């Protein structure tokens, strides 16, 4: 039955497919919002109305891309599909909870979209800082709906995290240790731990904001002895681990892709890669206040957060150089997935370098809330997370569907996307250094040139997104079946054929230790 299979699904592959489709759909919505932003900023003067509308679009763009595109695709889609296959488990540990995790997302998305349509919408930015998010500056239900949306998305992620942690720790074959699982499995495990530890703090913060708005509490209101800075601490204690949650599964996928298309049987420095991810996960929790260098912290506090933030560059560097070492001496196959992976390494490194610039508290005081910050995090998200998703998608597409994408189209798609995102975000570094502030719908004429170029780049990216839809249609319509897959001895997910049967690993796997 259709309903039994897709509505009441307990199969990790089907739920993974649902996550993928939902994430792709949300990605279209988020892309549409980003095109609205770049259309508004394409030239000086007003296009879409006042700044409230503009900020509602910016806020929705951020929430949609983070909570309904990147996280569902990376953790829900790739995680559900690949983790059980990679560790030889018959399914996830809690299959029905897995289904609930997915079905909490569409209502959450609905609440977020509803928040934009009631009153004047939630024009708070994705950070939802009070007093702007309080009931005076944002009277009406908009921010409340956004908070409920975040609650649902948060519950979904927490349940998913519990599920992945249990699955990865308990459902491996007894003969293998955690240090014999693939890097993608490790990345999902670490991501799940980060989610489990950070989301409750966000839930606390936004619940306090909810009571401030509706029940007359004063957690964040100085008039009653509260402090708006407390909200910033609570939010960023979640918000900083969150950005690592968005990129860590990507690290795992890139490790697999680089290894596979270099013709290697294992990545360079496996243990170093694992420890680097664990270090990044740990350090991600003790650097949150680098988002708050401008709120007037003590100089010694700023010194600590500056140095702690810079330390994260070390494990990140370990990962980048290990990827390069994996490429070294390999029989490199220039497949589309490999192009995405190489693009990821290059552009993520650039994003990391601007991150090091911003970690200096003294420099950040000048650059905070300018387009330099926007350029920085879009290099790591729009060219890190998205390139990893695209690389993983074209690499595992034959596994998910049993069909192959057209190689030439896939390479053309990569090229258009590469040009588009760089043309969009590279000029924003110049705008930021010239002092153009974020979250404004209009700007002085002096900034016109780079903004126009940036907006042109965004339309090139839009072309790439449309081409991707065509590519998927073309692949599903042409039905070129997969003949054989290489390197299956170290890529366990492929051993059941493409696509794998509905139930895999129905009996425990026999592990033979090889002394090679």
UniProtKB/Swiss-Prot annotation:
Cofactor annotation: heme; Cu cation
Intervals, Mitochondrial intermembrane compartment: 41-50, 118-140, 213-227, 287-298, 358-370, 434-446
Protein's membrane topology: Multi-pass membrane protein
InterPro entries from the UniProt entry: Cyt_c_oxase-like_su1_dom (IPR023616), Cyt_c_oxase-like_su1_sf (IPR036927), Cyt_C_Oxase_1 (IPR000883), Cyt_c_Oxase_su1_BS (IPR023615), Cyt_c_oxase_su1_dom (IPR033944)
Location of cross-link 1'-histidyl-3'-tyrosine (His-Tyr): 240-244
Record: residues binding Na(+): 40, 45, 441
UniProt binding sites for Fe(II)-heme a: 61, 378
GO cellular component terms given for this protein: mitochondrial inner membrane; respiratory chain complex IV
Group of enzyme by EC: translocase
Residues given in the record as Mg(2+) binding sites: 368-369
Short name of one Pfam family: COX1
Top-level taxonomic group: Eukaryota
Cofactor: record remark: Binds 2 heme A groups non-covalently per subunit. Binds a copper B center.
Catalytic activity of the protein: 4 Fe(II)-[cytochrome c] + O2 + 8 H(+)(in) = 4 Fe(III)-[cytochrome c] + 2 H2O + 4 H(+)(out)
Binding site for Cu cation: 240, 290-291
Record has S-adenosyl-L-methionine as a keyword: no
An individual GO BP term: electron transport coupled proton transport
GO molecular function annotation: cytochrome-c oxidase activity; heme binding; metal ion binding
Mitochondrial matrix side of membrane: 1-11, 87-94, 171-182, 262-269, 328-335, 401-406, 479-516
Similarity comment: Belongs to the heme-copper respiratory oxidase family.
Function: Component of the cytochrome c oxidase, the last enzyme in the mitochondrial electron transport chain which drives oxidative phosphorylation. The respiratory chain contains 3 multisubunit complexes succinate dehydrogenase (complex II, CII), ubiquinol-cytochrome c oxidoreductase (cytochrome b-c1 complex, complex III, CIII) and cytochrome c oxidase (complex IV, CIV), that cooperate to transfer electrons derived from NADH and succinate to molecular oxygen, creating an electrochemical gradient over the inner membrane that drives transmembrane transport and the ATP synthase.
Protein name according to UniProt: Cytochrome c oxidase subunit 1
Species this protein is from: Zygogeomys trichopus (Michoacan pocket gopher)
